[in-house]
């Protein structure tokens, strides 16, 4: 896969320190699926030599544009957020393994906190397009950090929790999961490690008793499927997308390795999407 030039179409601050950017990059948009990411690098002489990964938040094949969500708190993020329409960068993508939705799933539960919404946003569009029902649970510290509902399709049921109670429910977004898990055929999460570990623990305690795992069972259990395969992930109640920094995106630098249930796994190649049971959450 070769890097493609991308031109900024629009950039706007949607939350304090968080920018939504729309890039014209038809070569990257083509074939992009929810959960995948793009690698961004400067085209300027003397610019940042290392690429940074950004989840593909939306992708429109008709216009050839995609959106990413940029936090301006880091040097790279501040540099990228300062771009103006017409500016260009190198994009490499789509990269990584996407979410796998079981064809039988009609009810999808999405769980996000803070910038983690970017890792799930394209899944919202894909699910609505395919006629599925979506509940999005979103958590933030306060109302100032809540993802704007105007950026979501009207068909989505959007439920917010804030730590200070200034908007929606008071508390953590993880507190809301128990209210909706029985409704869901599958669930998908993106956010800080503490949130992912919490929802993974909930899913582990109910494995085989919720969602698509309970559908179409045959005596004898059917044929086994390999852990980490698309088929195995489609049967999982919970999939997560990890937000580790990805250096080479080719699996060679090993800078994004995390501990899996069966040994080390590379976020850039085996992920960034995993079935929750594939990862070692330290729950023993």
Q: Where do the protein language model's features map onto the residues?
A:
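Ferredoxin-reductase
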Residues: 1-85
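Structural signal for conserved beta-strand scaffold positions within catalytic alpha/beta enzyme cores
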Residues: 10, 58, 160-162, 240-242, ...
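Short, surface-exposed secondary-structure boundary micro-motifs
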Residues: 43-45, 94, 261
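Short, Lys/Arg- and Gly-enriched loop/turn segments at beta-strand edges
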Residues: 46-54, 96-104, 268
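FNR/FR-type flavoprotein reductase catalytic core
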Residues: 75-243
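Local cysteine-cluster metal-coordination motifs and their immediate loop/turn environment
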Residues: 119, 242-272
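Short microdomains enriched in Cys/His and/or Lys/Arg
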Residues: 269-284
């Amino acid at each position: 896969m070769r890097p493609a030039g991308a031109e900024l179409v629009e950039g706007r601050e949607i939350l304090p320190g968080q920018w939504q950017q729309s890039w014209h990059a038809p070569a990257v948009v083509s074939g992009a699926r929810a959960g995948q990411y793009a690698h961004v690098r400067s085209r300027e002489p003397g610019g940042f030599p290392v690429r940074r990964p950004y989840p593909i938040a939306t992708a429109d094949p008709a216009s050839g544009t995609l959106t990413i969500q940029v936090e301006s708190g880091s040097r790279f993020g501040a540099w990228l957020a300062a771009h103006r329409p017409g500016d260009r960068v190198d994009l490499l993508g789509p990269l990584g393994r996407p979410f796998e939705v079981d064809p039988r799933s009609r009810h999808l539960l999405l769980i996000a906190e803070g910038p983690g919404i970017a890792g799930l946003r394209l899944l919202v569009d894909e699910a609505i397009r395919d006629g599925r029902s979506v509940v999005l649970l979103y958590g933030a510290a306060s109302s100032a950090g809540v993802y704007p509902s105007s950026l979501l399709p009207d068909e989505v049921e959007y439920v917010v929790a804030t730590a200070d109670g200034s908007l929606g429910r008071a508390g953590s977004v993880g507190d809301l999961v128990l209210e909706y898990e029985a409704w869901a055929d599958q669930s998908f999460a993106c956010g800080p490690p503490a949130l992912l570990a919490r929802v993974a623990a909930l899913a582990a305690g109910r494995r085989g008793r919720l969602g698509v795992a309970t559908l179409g069972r045959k005596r004898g259990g059917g044929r086994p499927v390999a852990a980490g395969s698309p088929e195995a992930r489609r049967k999982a109640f919970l999939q997560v997308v990890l937000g580790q920094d990805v250096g080479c995106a080719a699996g060679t630098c090993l800078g994004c390795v995390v501990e899996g249930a069966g040994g080390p796994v590379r976020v850039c190649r085996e992920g960034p999407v995993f079935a929750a049971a594939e990862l070692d959450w330290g729950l023993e």
